[in-house]
Amino acid sequence: MALETTPWNVQDHLQTPEECVLYLEAVFEEARDDPAFIAKAIGDVARARGMTQTARAAGISREGLYKALSEEGNPSFGTVLKVLTALGLRLQVELEAT
């Protein structure tokens, strides 16, 4: 008998701002050396919160935002900061545990 599975979409699990923050914190912790993965994760949050609204608030075209935050995208640091601000988030720096 074949095992039946259902598609899993991360955006379905990013319903609150707190869930979005926890998701991005985990991504930054686990994939700190993978900018493409981090950009895609920010894109996941933007899609969960509404890509059109996020793009408008960031001052970026919707298509440009999809492209920048895709797996093949390579957003500028400025774009990342604009998107985080549009999502009501901010980048925070802390000391690495030694």
Where are these regions (language model features)?
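Short alpha-helical DNA-recognition segment
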Residues: 47-67
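Amphipathic alpha-helical interface surfaces
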Residues: 20, 34, 38, 42, ...
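DNA major-groove recognition helix of helix-turn-helix/homeodomain DNA-binding modules
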Residues: 76-94
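Extended, folded domain segments that form the structural surfaces/walls around functional sites
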Residues: 22-25, 65-67, 75
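N-terminal flexible/basic segments that precede or flank functional cores
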Residues: 1-41
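Short, charged recognition helix plus adjacent turn
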Residues: 3, 92-98
